[in-house]
């Protein structure tokens, strides 16, 4: 299964549309969002994805109540709060144990525990990936293009491989 991973929309709906089209072209079946919708209208658009979406809040998600309300009508949209993937909110996609947080300073220690197969984070607006034992730590970069080239990522659960992709 292919998972599309994105972060830091910062209300850039044009780039979000590009990201969603790219995910469709690449055959993504589920999405992981690592925080910073910023406004409810960005969350609303992401909630229109045709498959499951796993999402967390970021530091720039000001009106969390409004964001929660606009995604509440989509039973396939799972908004975990600050992080997802612990024992109470286990995220397993195609047998891969996943943790999602906005913050890399939490994600890297979580990746080092060995409890997860993949840990995804955002916040820095810089795409990166590294391995800690058998666990992948991946930051897809930013959709918004605020600090550089907009990027997203794909994760293939069958191959346990990932790819960073630039948006045009």
What do the PLM-derived regions correspond to, one by one?
Residues 3, 30, 96-98, 118:
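Structural motif
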Residues 50-99:
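Helix-adjacent hinge/juxtasegments
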């Amino acid at each position: 299964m292919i998972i599309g991973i994105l972060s830091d929309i910062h209300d850039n709906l044009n780039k979000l549309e590009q990201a969603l089209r790219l995910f469709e072209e690449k055959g993504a079946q589920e999405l992981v969002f690592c925080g910073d919708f910023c406004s409810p209208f960005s969350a609303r658009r992401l909630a229109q994805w045709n498959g499951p979406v796993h999402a967390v809040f970021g530091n720039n998600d000001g009106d969390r109540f409004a964001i929660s309300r606009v995604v509440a009508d989509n039973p396939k949209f799972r908004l975990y709060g600050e992080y997802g993937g612990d024992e109470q909110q286990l995220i397993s996609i195609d047998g891969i144990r996943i943790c999602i947080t906005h913050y890399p300073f939490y994600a890297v220690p979580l990746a080092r525990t060995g409890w997860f197969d993949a840990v995804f984070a955002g916040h820095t607006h810089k795409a990166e990936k590294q391995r800690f034992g058998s666990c992948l730590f991946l930051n897809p970069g930013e959709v918004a293009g605020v600090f550089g080239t907009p990027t997203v990522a794909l994760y293939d659960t069958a191959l346990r491989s990932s790819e960073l992709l630039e948006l045009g």
